[in-house]
């Protein structure tokens, strides 16, 4: 199967070669989202948007599109890619002497059969207290551009970094071990037919492996790809990993935040 990296990042290109020596690249064109209270959800949403846009560019090809989106979170503040040197300076000053999170959302998508699976990885990075001179010396190299949080970990030395907890590759931009696990899970996704819906939560109801399965964002008549996330003795819970055949009663949501706030949960009934 063809493997396509939906990114122009040289860092992600280098890291993906640890899994696939040969692959193609497609550059997605999206507007990244930073609205919302959950940074993990934001990173996943941006990764999914990249994968889907790349899928539109390659058509219905039977391939595995891999995309990622990395954000830095300091306290409750999400730090994206700085637009200019002044913003990068503010970011580094904010990170100085603190522990922050580096979150990478990952998405795997096959436009041929509409399988889509996403997850995230998180690494905790602690910075030493930085002097103004250290920050200015780093900024003078002009390497802060296109880097979440204003820095690339492979371009700074021990005078910046105090401790890393978690995947180093994740901080670079693509957590290789996490991606390997996701590829295995992607290849094990199952199909299910939805025949009912629960109230008041609105989960779709189907059967898989002889047990009732409750699936998010599904309506009667849908045929879906699913991943089981919780098993009970007589039933299980699963996430929707792509619609194979749409139900005749399914409609496209008017609100782009459908399913996130719950206000329009019953729209598809």
What are these regions (language model features)?
Residues 184-269:
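Non-catalytic accessory regions of SAM-dependent methyltransferases
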Residues 15-18, 35, 57:
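Short loop/helix-cap segments at secondary-structure boundaries that form the rim of catalytic
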């Amino acid at each position: 199967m063809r493997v396509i990296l939906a990114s122009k990042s040289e860092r992600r290109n280098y890291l993906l070669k640890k899994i696939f020596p040969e692959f193609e690249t497609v550059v997605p064109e999206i507007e990244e989202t930073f609205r919302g209270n959950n940074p993990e959800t934001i990173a996943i949403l941006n990764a999914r948007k990249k994968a889907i846009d790349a899928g539109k560019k390659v058509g219905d090809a039977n391939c595995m599109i891999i995309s990622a989106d990395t954000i830095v979170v300091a306290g409750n503040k999400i730090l994206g890619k700085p637009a200019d040197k002044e913003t990068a300076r503010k970011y580094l000053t904010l990170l100085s002497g603190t522990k922050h999170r580096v979150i990478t959302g990952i998405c795997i998508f096959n436009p041929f059969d509409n399988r889509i699976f996403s997850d995230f990885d998180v690494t905790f990075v602690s910075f030493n207290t930085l002097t103004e001179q250290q920050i200015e010396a780093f900024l003078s190299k002009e390497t802060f551009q296109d880097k979440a949080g204003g820095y690339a970990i492979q371009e700074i030395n021990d005078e910046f970094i105090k401790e890393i907890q978690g995947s180093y590759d994740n901080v670079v931009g693509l957590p290789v071990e996490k991606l390997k696990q996701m590829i295995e899970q992607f290849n094990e996704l199952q199909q299910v037919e939805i025949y009912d819906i629960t109230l008041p939560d609105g989960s779709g109801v189907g059967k898989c492996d002889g047990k009732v399965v409750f699936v998010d964002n599904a309506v009667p008549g849908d045929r879906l790809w699913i991943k089981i996330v919780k098993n009970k003795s007589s039933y299980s819970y699963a996430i929707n990993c792509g619609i194979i055949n749409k139900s005749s009663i399914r409609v496209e949501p008017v609100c782009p935040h459908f399913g996130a706030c719950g206000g329009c949960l019953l729209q598809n009934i």
